[in-house]
Amino acid sequence: MKNNPLISVVTVSYNAVLTIEQTILSVINQTYPHIEYIIIDGGSTDGTVDIIKKYANRIAYWVSEPDKGIYDAMNKGIRTAKGEWINFMNAGDLFYSKDTLEKVFSKSINDNIKVIYGDVMLNKQGVLSQGKVYPISFMQIAMPFCHQSSFSHISEYTHGFNLQFYSHTS
């Protein structure tokens, strides 16, 4: 068990000038001190990069270059990450509060745990998804939680995402 591990938060973006800043602020204003913030931008042309540059001193690594879609960008983030845990916080997504990471990672986490997840606020009115417990076999057919609310141990990303699988997000 390890206290206060390094958390890599990866934001992928493409032409997200209207939403990237709120995401950056949500990450860099976390009270948890052990955060490596990574932004992988797909070569935006709308001013997104200017906003990223504005906060460059608070971002461990960022790049803006063409990619093959969201999962290629996420794989770039995985390869760059040095943290023990990874979270994918896309442009436009926010942590629920400034102390979200502190609440999750300030206590010891059993070495056998490889994924941590929580509820997600679905809209600004505060409507929350209802947490449900699914058998592990459910993950073979569907993701029972949003990646924005999950933290996965780096060991779960040995091979990254398979770019050959069809995705509705591409």
Language model segments and positions:
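Conserved short acidic donor-positioning loop in nucleotide-sugar-dependent glycosyltransferases
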Residues: 27, 42-43, 68-69
